[in-house]
From Swiss-Prot:
Disulfide bonds: none
Active-site feature positions: 54
Entry's family note: Belongs to the aldo/keto reductase family.
Source organism of this protein record: Candida tropicalis
Binding site for substrate: 116
Keyword terms of this UniProt record: Carbohydrate metabolism, NAD, NADP, Oxidoreductase, Xylose metabolism
InterPro entries: AKR (IPR020471), AKR2B1 (IPR044486), Aldo/ket_reductase_CS (IPR018170), NADP_OxRdtase_dom (IPR023210), NADP_OxRdtase_dom_sf (IPR036812)
Protein name: NAD(P)H-dependent D-xylose reductase I,II
Gene it is expressed from: xyrA
Keyword Oxidoreductase included in the entry's annotation: yes
SUPFAM superfamilies assigned to the protein according to its UniProt record, in alphabetical order: NAD(P)-linked oxidoreductase
EC number: 1.1.1.307
Pathway membership: Carbohydrate metabolism; D-xylose degradation
Catalytic activity: xylitol + NAD(+) = D-xylose + NADH + H(+); xylitol + NADP(+) = D-xylose + NADPH + H(+)
């Protein structure tokens, strides 16, 4: 097996180790996913962050299983994340959704399973539409179910006990929701995944969560960049972080790319990152973000960029008040 970069890990409260740098599967096309995952494993990636809602878990699984079959990696060396979508929050539907994920990935277990959003949409049978996305069984109209988050969480805890999930966690949760969930949970969330970039830094949330012993993964590390292809008006009207003078100056000083600076800004504070790339050179670059340190001045200057600008807000879907 070829020499691959050694990626630092975060020790989770569940006892498992999660790589600090991974490969994000959001918006990876069905046509390219298997090859991209396979090539990422060859490059040295071991954490793959997927979700039911991404609609590409079959192809992601093909890439993973090809690499395992060829001896590039063992299953236990990989850290595979998936996420429970909003239509499957009712406890009686949680295992059905997980089984679909495991079947698509062609794996016996996932290392981490997150509640994707603290929102319960109306259940949609898998045979009717999968992944359902925003479909709630009635055209473009949103419909919801009265399912408390703790009920969904208890169903996930049972699946940990059954050996189908190693660690469970949450995504897009606020501090108050986390505070409440911890008080009813038997198994504490191992990971919180949040939108995290210099325009949206959330320092108080990060301080609270890390002190509570919960690891953090940041998504959309490049800020508006992730949302340009979705034609988000907010993203289109925001200067890219790659071109921001502060980021460019820091990158030049360290002889690194702006992307590497943005990723190191997170990993240096023990926040995992999950960028993706089709480009082999950038794939390797994104993995090489632990071999330099930003100075206190660098960190202070990046801190000044925080404007509380969120690009992934369910209020834009149907006035869903998670972040209001």
């Amino acid at each position: 097996m070829s020499t691959t970069p050694t990626i630092p890990t975060i020790k989770l409260n569940s006892g498992y180790e999660m790589p600090l740098v991974g490969f994000g599967c959001w918006k990876v096309t069905n046509a390219t996913a298997a090859d991209q995952i396979y090539n990422a494993i060859k490059t040295g990636y071991r954490l793959f962050d997927g979700a039911e809602d991404y609609g590409n878990e079959k192809e992601v699984g093909e890439g993973i299983n090809r690499a395992i079959k060829e001896g590039l990696v063992k299953r236990e060396e990989l850290f595979i994340t998936s996420k429970l979508w909003n239509n499957f929050h009712d406890p009686k539907n949680v295992e059905t959704a997980l089984n679909k994920t495991l079947s698509d990935l062609n794996l016996d277990y996932v290392d981490l399973f997150l509640i994707h959003f603290p929102i319960a949409f109306k259940f949609v049978p898998i045979e009717e539409k999968y992944p359902p996305g925003f479909y709630c069984g009635d055209g473009d109209n949103f419909h919801y179910e009265d399912v408390p988050l703790l009920d969904t969480w208890k169903a996930l805890e049972k699946l940990v006990e059954a050996g189908k999930i190693k660690s469970i966690g949450i995504s897009n949760f606020t501090g108050a929701l986390i505070y409440d969930l911890i008080r009813g949970a038997t198994i504490k969330p191992a990971v919180l995944q949040i939108e995290h970039h210099p325009y949206l830094q959330q320092p108080k949330l990060i301080e609270y969560v890390q002190k509570a012993g919960i690891a953090i993964t940041g998504y959309s590390s490049f800020g508006p960049q992730s949302f340009l292809e979705l034609e988000s008006k907010r993203a289109l009207n925001t200067p890219t972080l790659f071109e921001h003078e502060t980021i460019k100056l820091i990158a030049d000083k360290h002889g690194k790319s702006p992307a590497q600076v943005l990723l190191r800004w997170a990993t240096q504070r023990n926040i995992a990152v999950i960028p993706k790339s089709n480009n082999p050179e950038r794939l390797a670059q994104n993995l090489s973000v632990v071999d330099f340190d930003l100075t206190k001045d660098d960190l202070d200057n990046i801190a000044k960029l925080d404007i509380g600008l969120r690009f992934n807000d369910p209020w834009d879907w149907d006035n869903i008040p998670i972040f209001v």
